[in-house]
């Protein structure tokens, strides 16, 4: 899917890491929340409260989820899951466009 229809969008962006990671919250009609964002090259660490699905639409990054020993290369068209109450490290190698979906369990 290249777009979302009939959604509500927060006017203010979520800005992290001195503007190197920027996203906007969108809310679907079923009540679910997603963020659409862009990450510039660099290293980042995020913590999760809920389970997350990260879909990579363009670019390239390495990810290491808490508890993993090795980095995993993720490229355009790939995704990865992060458990709730966890964390993950990213090494963005090329500008990334992404969607993050949040789940209750």
Where are these regions (language model features)?
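Residue-level recognition of conserved beta-strand positions in structured domain cores
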Residues: 38, 48, 65, 92, ...
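General beta-strand recognition
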Residues: 35, 45, 62, 89, ...
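Ligand-binding loop in jelly-roll beta-barrel domains
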Residues: 83-105
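Short loop/turn motifs at secondary-structure junctions and domain boundaries
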Residues: 17, 44-46, 64
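Short, conserved beta-strand element in jelly-roll/cupin
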Residues: 48-63
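Short acidic-glycine-tyrosine-enriched beta hairpin
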Residues: 68-88
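A short, N-terminal "cap"/entry segment at the start of jelly-roll beta-barrel domains
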Residues: 1-31
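Conserved short histidine dyad/triad with adjacent acidic residue
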Residues: 27-49, 79-84
């Amino acid at each position: 899917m290249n777009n979302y229809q009939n959604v509500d969008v927060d006017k203010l962006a979520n800005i992290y890491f001195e503007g190197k990671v920027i996203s906007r919250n969108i809310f679907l009609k079923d009540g679910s929340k997603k963020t659409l964002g862009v990450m510039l090259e660099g290293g980042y660490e995020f913590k999760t409260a809920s389970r997350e699905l990260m879909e990579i639409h363009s670019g390239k990054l390495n990810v290491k989820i808490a508890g993993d020993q090795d980095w995993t290369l993720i490229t355009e068209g790939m995704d990865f899951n992060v458990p709730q109450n966890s964390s993950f490290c990213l090494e963005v190698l090329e500008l990334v466009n992404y969607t993050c979906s949040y789940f209750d369990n």
